[in-house]
Curated annotation (Swiss-Prot):
Residues 58-74, 131-145, 204-218, 277-291, 350-364 have a biased composition (Acidic residues). Pfam families: Spy1. This is Speedy protein E3. It comes from the Eukaryota. Residues 1-15 have a biased composition (Low complexity). Transmembrane segments: none annotated. It comes from Homo sapiens (Human).
Length: 549
């Protein structure tokens, strides 16, 4: 009886769980594997350098079996790059794309951004973006930033490249976020200059004023920081957007009536005294333009050059002369000029009032020359440049060795035709004629000496001796006036006529030599002293009429 009794009700009916749903009976011989429902029995796969990832959920048994995706192919990728060497490693390309992970996470937690957090190189995870409101429509996501290879270090011919990601968050988004947190405050981050602390923030503009358009960000450029031989070190510096006139306008508002320009100091001197303030009653005058600054070479050593910035003065020398002329009317305002290593020159002798004023020779130009040089310091002084070059002195000394000129100077013992001043005028005429020094010959010496006697001497007789030494004894008695040439040429023999034509040619050459000097035959006493000071010990300068007894 007992064996045929039915089983209790509890065993026949399925048990109910606490939630009210019946529990399914599990048959052991249906599927071999773990007893946990919904688990993929396939062995787990591990990625390179990571722990085991969780397997995807098994699809429902009711759905038809889908075609399996092909196995991923393996490819060779560059692992490291060092100079010209590259190490390649074989890795498998994953078939699971990132968008599948995002779709899975979106189903688990609706309304949360499913994209995985991104971490920058060498930093911790960045904070997640704030969740957008559920009421707003979903916006189109920005495309993923592309990664690129950038040069990390550069050493000789070796270059190390590193892959970095381009950030999608632009600086203006940070500024917009800061503007929402603190309205009325400039959201731009503080900028620090190189080697300095943070600059003070600009003053906040009034809330009543309309917001002005922001100036564009200054561009950065590479500038040469140091220069040593053929090596150059470049450093990136930012170009400032604040111009000097803005500082001056700010200072003008703080102290009206005061010159806002910063004081400028000369090299090795203290600050200059400030200009006196003009009267408030006078109208404001137009300010003179600021002098431009330029870079000049201070020192030069081999391939190295040290440049220093110096300011060009706006005060010209003629303004100093006009100022001195007002202080002492009737006095020459030009500063006294002294020759190199000599005392003041002797003043010119006063010419007679009855004589007409002669044409003055052009004054030589003045320039700045180095007076002393000590280390890196140089003292400059303004001196007058002589118009007579050294090659003309050499040409004059070369002609003094001519035998005809030697006999002529030895004959003139009374110094009536060739004293030291007349010979100095010969050197001045050589300089004014402008011929090369090697072209001056014996004829040019006598042409210049004849022209010097025309300017300084009134006696015509001594000049006839020039033709005696130049052409012979026949021409010592011939007058020098052109109106007598043709009268004297008729009774002469053919040889005398030939010599007479030579004298006419000499007079023609004398006029051409005078025109080559631009008709400037007068030489100032100062220039004669300078010519003699070039070589004071020369024997020619001993030919002085004052020493004759």
């Amino acid at each position: 009886m007992t064996s045929h009794q039915p089983q209790p009700q509890e065993e026949q009916s399925p048990q109910r769980s606490t939630s009210g749903y019946p529990l399914q009976e599990v048959v052991d011989d249906e599927v071999s594997g773990p007893s946990a429902p919904g688990v993929d029995p396939s062995p787990p796969r591990r990625s390179l350098g990571c722990k085991r990832k969780r397997e995807c959920l098994d699809e429902s048994d009711d759905e038809p079996e889908k075609e399996l995706a092909p196995e991923p192919e393996e490819t060779w990728v560059a692992e490291t790059l060092c100079g010209l060497k590259m190490k390649a490693k074989r890795r498998r390309v994953s078939l699971v794309l990132p968008e599948y992970y995002e779709a899975f996470n979106r189903l688990l937690a609706p309304g949360v951004d499913p994209s995985p957090p991104r971490r920058s190189l060498g930093c911790k995870r960045k904070r997640e973006c704030l969740d957008e409101s559920d009421d707003e429509p979903e916006k189109e996501l920005a495309p993923e930033p592309e990664e690129t290879w950038v040069a990390e270090t550069l050493c000789g011919l070796k270059m190390k490249a590193k892959r970095r990601r381009v950030s999608l968050v632009l600086p203006e988004y940070y500024e917009a976020f800061n503007r929402l947190l603190a309205p009325g405050v400039d959201p731009s981050p503080p900028r620090r200059s190189l080697g300095c602390k943070r600059k003070r923030e600009c003053l906040d503009e009034s809330d009543d004023e309309p917001e002005k358009e922001l100036a564009p960000e200054p561009e950065e450029t590479w500038v040469a920081e140091t220069l040593c031989g053929l090596k150059m070190k470049a450093k990136r510096r930012r170009v400032s957007l604040v111009l000097p006139e803005y500082y001056e306008a700010f200072n003008r508002l703080l102290a009206p009536g005061v010159d806002p320009s910063p004081p400028r100091r000369s090299l090795g001197c203290k600050r200059k005294r400030e200009c006196l303030d003009e009267s408030d009653d006078e109208p404001e005058k137009e300010l003179a333009p600021e002098p431009e600054e330029t870079w000049v070479a201070e020192t030069l050593c081999g391939l190295k050059m040290k440049a220093k910035r110096r300011r060009v003065s706006l005060v010209l020398p003629e303004y100093y002369e006009a100022f001195n002329r007002l202080l002492a009317p009737g006095v020459d305002p030009s500063p006294p000029r002294r020759s190199l290593g000599c005392k003041r020159k002797r003043e010119c002798l006063d010419e007679s009032d009855d004589e007409p004023e002669k044409e003055l020779a052009p004054e030589p130009e003045e320039t700045w020359v180095a007076e002393t040089l000590c280390g890196l310091k140089m003292k400059a002084k303004r001196r007058r440049v002589s118009l007579v070059l050294p090659e003309y002195y050499e040409a004059f000394n070369r002609l003094l060795e001519d035998p005809v000129i030697k006999r002529f100077l030895a004959w003139d013992k009374d110094l009536r035709v060739s004293d030291k001043y007349l010979l100095a005028m010969v050197i001045a005429y050589f300089s004014r004629a402008g011929l090369p020094s090697w072209q001056y010959q014996r004829i040019h010496f006598f042409l210049a000496l004849y022209l010097a006697n025309d300017m300084e001497e009134d006696d015509e007789a001594p000049k006839q001796k020039i033709f005696y030494f130049l052409y012979g004894k026949t021409h010592s008695h011939i007058p020098l006036r052109p109106k007598h040439w043709f009268q004297l040429c008729r009774p002469m023999n053919p040889r005398a006529r030939k010599n007479c034509s030579q004298i006419a040619l000499f007079q023609k050459r004398r006029f051409q030599f005078f025109c080559s000097m631009r008709c400037r035959a007068w030489v100032s006493p100062e220039e004669l002293e300078e010519i003699q000071a070039y070589d004071p010990e020369h024997w020619v300068w001993a030919r002085d009429r004052a020493h004759l007894s």
